[in-house]
UniProtKB/Swiss-Prot annotation:
One of two assembly initiator proteins, it binds directly to the 5'-end of the 23S rRNA, where it nucleates assembly of the 50S subunit. Part of the 50S ribosomal subunit. NCBIfam families: rplX_bact (TIGR01079). It comes from Shewanella sediminis (strain HAW-EB3). GO terms for biological process: translation. It holds the Pfam family KOW. This is Large ribosomal subunit protein uL24.
Length: 104
């Protein structure tokens, strides 16, 4: 199945503690989860590793979020939108369902 949400897409969170926030997808995991910049931040206790030059402490990092809890953001309408697929000139392209514009 083709991916409706891909890397570098701007998404908006529909459910959870970060509901309503927007961010850019930095990674799509094969388990159906996404890592979105600035969303679902968790504190990780990092053990120091002098061989790699890593300082210890508590660091904040993005945790994966379920893909069903986000929707692609349509900048033309300023709202969350659904994505469809169609063929144009032999190429399969994604488009927004609300206004039929192509996803960039």
């Amino acid at each position: 199945m083709a991916a409706k949400i891909r890397r570098e897409d701007e998404v908006i969170v529909l459910a959870g503690k970060d509901q309503g926030k927007r961010g850019k997808v930095s990674q799509v995991l094969p388990t159906g989860k996404l890592i979105v910049e600035g969303i679902n931040l968790v504190k990780k206790h990092q053990k120091p590793n002098p061989q790699l030059g890593v300082a210890g402490g508590i660091v904040e990092q993005e945790a994966p979020i379920q893909a069903s809890n986000v929707a692609i953001f349509n900048s033309a309408t300023g709202k969350a939108d659904r994505v469809g697929f169609r063929f144009e000139d032999g190429q399969k392209v994604r488009f927004f369902k609300s206004n039929s514009e192509l996803v960039k």
